[in-house]
Amino acid sequence: MQFEVLKRFFPKESLKNCKGALWVHTASIGEFNTFLPILKELKREHRILLTYFSPRAREYLKTKSDFYDCLHPLPLDNPFSVKRFEELSKPKALIVVEREFWPSLIIFTKVPKILVNAYAKGSLIEKILSKKFDLIIMRTQEDVEKFKTFGAKRVFSCGNLKFICQKGKGIKLKGEFIVAGSIHTGEVEIILKAFKEIKKTYSSLKLILVPRHIENAKIFEKKARDFGFKTSFFENLEGDVILVDRFGILKELYPVGKIAIVGGTFVNIGGHNLLEPTCWGIPVIYGPYTHKVNDLKEFLEKEGAGFEVKNETELVTKLTELLSVKKEIKVEEKSREIKGCYLEKLREFLRGL
């Protein structure tokens, strides 16, 4: 930790190895993953110098070395540290992801600066520093208009980077499934009750049940048996309810579903990733507790891909409706538009340097 602080105050000479690279700053793991679809494309065209702020991000980013050439903590926000960092690395440009308004970084560096996935809050620091960026790509046109009143010049809207699909290969299974992902204790009963009702009409339908915490798989399996369901564990597909007791495959399971249900939304958790199933053209249902994913919820409802239900009765009604009529989900198309817009603006700017 002391060494990390020293590197922030007195950036390392080894930065000279990354001279002329494109400097990308993603403060945390969340910002890195949000920007990753764009970073993958930029890495094909530029050497990348990646900086981070969160100490937790360092260990995670070490496992993602395919996407950068040099990794260094963000210099401390004082004139000496940021100037030394720039002097050693001589970057081609700086891309700042989201709302990293560090005054010394933005004021005392001479490198061309780009702000991406930005949104307007109207804070004083935002009003002062936004005009220091040479290119700003924002989430909405309303954000653009607000930043223009602050004196920002080259400002565009491309949408929210969080809405870009990041799909895996997907798993192929025979049968008809509802996939319930990231389910917490306290909401599993709601889903099992609704599924029991749906099975009266759709007897061949199966439920793939993925707990948020894998250690709950056996508890959920017992609850399913208590409801009278035949159960099995993935990859055995003989049960009416198939429990998943392994990490990291939920994203790959969504494409087998006719419908997805995302957890953390029927209890007061705030929701998990609502986007993943819709990237495969699968409609997603969620409960009323979505305060952590409101931006995704609003986007999906606008695209006709997301559906909120308040209780078990509404869940049965919505499942019946979506099972009876094939719904066309075009989220991936919208995702490609957003990604294409960001890449077009960034490439155009970088070509001009």
Curated annotation (Swiss-Prot):
Annotated effect of mutating E98A: Nearly complete loss of catalytic activity
Keyword flag Nucleotide-binding: no
Site features described as Transition state stabilizer, chain residue numbers: E98, K162
Keyword flag Cell division: no
Temperature dependence, free-text field: Highly thermostable. Does not lose activity after 16 hours at 70 or 80 degrees Celsius, but incubation of the enzyme at 90 and 99 degrees Celsius for 1 hour results in gradual loss of activity.
Protein origin, superkingdom: Bacteria
InterPro entries xrefs: Glycos_transf_N, Glycos_transf_N_sf, Kdotransferase
Membrane topology: Peripheral membrane protein
E.C. code: 2.4.99.12
Annotated binding of CMP, by residue: P211, R212, F247, G248, I249, N273, L274, L275, E276
GO biological process: lipid A biosynthetic process; lipopolysaccharide core region biosynthetic process
The protein, known as: 3-deoxy-D-manno-octulosonic acid transferase
Gene: kdtA
